[in-house]
Amino acid sequence: MARKKEFRYRGYTFEELLNMSLEDFAKLLPARQRRSLKRGLSPEQKKLLRKIRLAKKGKYNKPIRTHSRDMVILPEMVGMTIHVYNGKEFVPVEIKEEMIGHYLGEFALTRKIVQHGSPGVGATRSSMFVAIK
């Protein structure tokens, strides 16, 4: 039976990532995410991080909702369910280890996938001569 492969981010195990400081973790990220962390967290992002830390301790019971789609997913967020706003509603996003280093907004799609129905009368040349019920 195949064993599940242990998760590693840039050669570091999840436990090592949890013990790293934010500055050390930022050095492992791609340039765009590293730049956004280097410039500092916005007040909304700091508020979100505070709520996540409270929820981990069990002191925040409500679902965590945020508009901060540009928040980089940090190792301390893993295991949480965060409701991310997509422009219309809050989409629940369960944070997994593989999501580390991505943005929250990547997992809450803003556009709906088109579900085309059957074409109407007159939609094609051949349907012009189909009798309407």
From Swiss-Prot:
Taxonomic lineage: Archaea, Methanobacteriati, Methanobacteriota, Thermococci, Thermococcales
Keywords annotated in UniProt: Ribonucleoprotein, Ribosomal protein, RNA-binding, rRNA-binding
Molecular function GO terms recorded: rRNA binding; structural constituent of ribosome
Domain of life: Archaea
Gene that this sequence comes from: rps19
Stated role: Protein S19 forms a complex with S13 that binds strongly to the 16S ribosomal RNA.
GO cellular component: cytosolic small ribosomal subunit
The keyword Flavoprotein is assigned to this record: no
Protein name listed in UniProt: Small ribosomal subunit protein uS19
One GO-annotated biological process of the protein: ribosomal small subunit assembly
Signal sequence segment: none
UniProt cross-references to SUPFAM superfamilies, sorted A to Z: Ribosomal protein S19
Family according to the record: Belongs to the universal ribosomal protein uS19 family.
